[in-house]
Amino acid sequence: DIARFEARAVRLFRRVMPFVRLTSSMARRTSIDDRFFFKGAPAVIVVIARGDIDGALAASNMELMAQAHGLGVLYSGFFTMAARLSRGLRRELGLGRKQKVVTALVLGYPAVRYRRTAPKEAAAISWK
């Protein structure tokens, strides 16, 4: 099913990209290959909800749990956009009339292992 969903989304993006490239320099630098949305990952969680807040909170907890188990997580915002644009993709995902794709979490074991986090400046926090 993952491959079928991705293939449908790729077809949609390939159809609309010529128009998007007219106004977006980022789109002009982007090529849409067959693995554009899910990057060949072994698992994808498509978060479906009636409202954005509930779905986003659920996705955030899923991300934390996946990372706690050593998985890497990528939010595929482009797949979310494709699902919102394509009635056929929504139908294929089995969405009800009041449901929508809030996000898609692409899961897999990271190909790299970081030795440390990126350096960050201390946050300026004031309590009142």
PLM features per residue range, with description:
Residues 3, 7, 84-87, 99:
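Generic alpha-helical secondary structure signal
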Residues 29-32, 89-92, 111:
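Glycine-rich, charged/polar anion/phosphate-binding loops
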